[in-house]
Structures are given as structure tokens and as C-alpha cells.
């Protein structure tokens, strides 16, 4: 779904996509060893945990709620109330305590760990908890002497962080929200690009919900007002969705600044159900689709403008936005 705002100083869009197993039709049984030579792949475990891997990498699917990473870089995301996912590495065991985190195992079998949300437990003997916003390099989790605090840096994990939310690619003036930004998007001021923010996941969008756009094709503003009689924008069946917010929130322009035309493309791994493009609908769906820690009360300028344009591809997996920013 897409929602956005009504002045060039701020855009926001929301996109829900149909939720299904992230195996591209291939199930991996426990004990299966995977070697990835190029690209990225995302695994959805039966427990609900999601593991996004970037090549070059080697890992083994150990059980419905655990894996072993021999080498490479991964992001582990354990959404909602799920806890207990275990990632084994040559340096030792990393246990989820309700979190998302990134791990890179180098050629010397050391594991560099960064916790994005929540917390993890490192090691079985002398276990140590690592909280969000912290990072550690582990050579042997059995010994506290082989654990070293390092600078927290998420940049090397941004590709797998986005993949863990089902994003296949971004092009143009857009970047994916860093860990921590999704809980407070109103605080992110960025004049250089739009921000794509993952919101709630696995949400039931009921039959009869009104959206702004549900059909593929090119749609130009101004977008229709809320109108239940518009059957072309009403969901005909209840659908489980993940939601994304696309926003632009620039710093206050100077007297000499100039607006510009921006084209942005977002590729999503599964079909987009629809797009919300007006403030009234965006506000209506906030309780269901917004991140639970975000409060949009007080924001005035929401929605897309009359000169904005949105194109949804025929396979519903690519959205192109053209905005004045």
C-alpha cells in the first residue's frame, strides 16, 4: 500500500505485500548445507525467523529454528513474539532473545556481531548478553577473554537488512531505513533521498478495506478522496500483508534552494496488494499498519501531490514513483 504527504518537504508511502513462504518454491530439510557464491538469498524458518545471507557464504540449516554459519555475512530477524533462534558459528553460539542482528564470520573464523534491535546471548559457557546498538567480535564464545567490544556499524549489513524485509532492490533517490530509524521516522531529516521504512508485518488487512491504488499501471495525481463506492480500490478478500512507508522529510529549504523532480524504483520480493496515496486513508490504516512504536499524531502534511505519479508493474513487484521534492 502507499501513503504520502501533501507538501514537497515530506512524502510518505505505505505498501503492503502478500505474505508467503520465502523459499521460492524450494524447501530445505534440516542438515542441508548451502554454499552461496554470488548474490543474496533469504531463508524463512518454520519458527518464523528470517535469515538473509550475502555471498560468499556457507551455512547449514540445522533445524526449524537454528542454523550454522561457517563463513559469510548474514542478518537474522526474529519478528514479533518469537524467540529462541540459534545461530552457531565457528566462534560459538548466538541465541536470539527477541531481536534482529547481523553476523559476519571471517577467514579466521572470528564472528563480528552487531545487534540492531532487542538483545542476544553470546556463548553457552559464561554467556553474555549484547543489547541493541552494540557490537562485539568473538573469537571463542567459551572464553570471555576472546570477546572484544567493537564500534557499532550497520553499513556492511544494510543489503541483508533490507533483504530480511523482502526488498529485492532500490534505485534512484531512495535508501532503506537503518536499524533504529523505523521506530522514529519523523526524526529522520534527509534532503538527499527518500526513505523506505519497514512497518508492521503479518497484518490481516480485512476484506472491504479501501486503498488508493490496487491495479497495475500508471496512476497520476491528484488521487481520489476516500470513497467507499469506488469498487476499483476496495479489497475483495482479506489478505495478510507486510507494510512499508515511503517518506521524504527534508531540512528547511533555504531561499535559494530549488525543488527537483525525483524518480524512485522499489522492487519487492512478493506482490504488492495496493498503495495508499491520501492522508485520510493513511490515517485510517495507521493503527493496523504503522510500526507499533510510531505515533503520527500531529503530522499535517501526508499524502501524494497532484503532480506525483505512481506506476505498479504488471507482476505487482516493482513500483516506480515520480515526485517533486
What are these regions (language model features)?
Residues 1-155:
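Short acidic/polar, Gly/Pro-enriched loop/turn segments located at secondary-structure boundaries
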Residues 21, 35, 42, 60, ...:
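Ser/Thr- (and often Asn-) enriched beta-sheet segments in non-cytosolic proteins
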Residues 26-28, 32, 40, 73, ...:
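Intrinsically disordered, low-complexity regions
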Residues 151-298:
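Propeptides and adjacent flexible N-terminal/non-core segments of secreted
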Residues 301-325:
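Ser/Thr/Pro-rich, low-complexity mucin-like regions
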Amino acid at each position: 500500500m502507499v501513503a504520502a504527504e501533501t507538501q514537497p518537504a515530506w512524502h510518505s508511502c505505505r505498501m503492503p505485500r502478500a505474505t508467503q513462504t520465502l523459499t521460492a518454491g524450494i524447501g530445505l530439510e534440516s542438515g542441508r548445507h548451502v554454499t552461496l557464491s554470488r548474490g543474496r538469498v533469504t531463508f524463512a524458518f518454520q519458527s518464523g525467523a528470517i535469515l538473509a545471507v550475502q555471498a560468499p557464504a556457507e551455512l547449514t540449516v540445522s533445524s526449524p529454528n537454528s542454523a550454522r554459519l561457517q563463513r559469510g555475512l548474514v542478518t537474522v530477524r526474529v519478528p514479533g513474539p518469537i524467540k529462541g533462534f540459534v545461530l552457531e558459528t565457528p566462534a560459538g553460539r548466538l541465541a536470539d532473545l527477541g531481536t534482529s542482528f547481523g553476523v559476519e564470520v571471517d577467514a579466521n573464523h572470528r564472528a563480528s556481531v552487531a545487534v540492531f534491535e532487542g538483545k542476544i546471548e553470546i556463548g553457552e559457557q559464561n554467556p553474555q548478553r549484547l543489547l541493541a546498538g552494540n557490537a562485539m567480535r568473538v573469537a571463542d564464545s567459551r572464553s570471555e577473554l576472546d570477546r572484544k567490544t567493537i564500534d557499532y556499524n550497520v553499513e556492511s549489513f544494510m543489503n541483508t537488512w533490507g533483504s530480511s524485509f523482502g526488498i529485492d532492490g532500490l534505485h534512484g533517490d531512495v535508501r532503506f531505513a537503518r536499524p533504529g530509524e523505523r521506530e522514529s521516522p519523523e526524526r529522520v531529516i534527509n534532503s538527499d533521498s527518500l526513505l523506505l521504512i519497514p512497518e508492521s508485518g503479518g497484518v490481516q488487512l480485512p476484506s472491504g478495506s479501501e486503498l488508493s491504488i490496487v491495479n497495475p499501471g500508471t496512476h497520476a495525481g491528484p488521487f481520489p478522496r476516500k470513497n467507499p463506492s469506488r469498487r476499483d480500490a476496495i479489497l475483495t478478500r482479506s489478505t495478510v500483508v507486510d507494510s512499508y512507508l515511503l517518506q521524504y522529510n527534508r531540512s528547511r529549504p533555504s531561499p535559494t534552494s530549488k525543488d527537483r523532480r525525483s524518480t524512485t524504483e522499489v522492487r519487492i520480493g512478493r506482490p504488492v496488494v495496493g498503495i495508499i496515496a491520501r492522508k485520510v486513508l493513511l490515517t485510517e490504516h495507521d493503527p493496523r499498519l504503522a510500526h507499533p512504536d510510531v505515533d503520527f499524531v500531529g503530522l499535517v502534511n501526508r499524502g501524494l501531490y497532484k503532480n506525483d505519479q505512481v506506476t505498479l508493474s504488471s507482476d505487482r513487484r516493482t513500483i516506480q514513483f515520480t515526485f517533486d521534492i
